[in-house]
């Protein structure tokens, strides 16, 4: 089963952080994939990704509007960087691109 992990963060750390997390989770689950999303919002890290989550992930999605804390833990993984607004509005399209990429590398 494909496993996707993601970290969402936005400049204000409020609504878009959580809206993006929800949209990415829904889009990945619609593909039948396992997904876990860490949020880095105004109240800190929530649903923090473990070393095991990172090691077992097929793909990492990071929002790029502001810096992601502890990004070095994803060294060696395939990373897709997206705008927070795209994660909210175009999560299905992001997952389709990931699916195509994974099919090419399989």
From Swiss-Prot:
Q: Cite the Gene3D superfamilies for this sequence.
A: 3.40.50.2300
Catalytic site residues?
10
The segment(s) forming the PTS EIIB type-2 domain are: 1-103
GO:BP terms for this protein?
fructose import across plasma membrane; phosphoenolpyruvate-dependent sugar phosphotransferase system
Q: Which Pfam families match?
A: PTS_IIB
Localization of this protein: Cytoplasm
Q: Report the top EC class in one word.
A: transferase
Listed EC numbers = 2.7.1.202
Q: What is known of its domains?
A: The PTS EIIB type-2 domain is phosphorylated by phospho-EIIA on a cysteinyl residue. Then, it transfers the phosphoryl group to the sugar substrate concomitantly with the sugar uptake processed by the PTS EIIC type-2 domain.
Molecular function terms from GO? kinase activity; protein-N(PI)-phosphohistidine-fructose phosphotransferase system transporter activity; protein-phosphocysteine-D-fructose-phosphotransferase system transporter activity
**What's the protein called, per UniProt?**
PTS system fructose-like EIIB component 2
| Catalysed reactions, semicolon-separated | D-fructose(out) + N(pros)-phospho-L-histidyl-[protein] = D-fructose 1-phosphate(in) + L-histidyl-[protein]
Which superkingdom? Bacteria
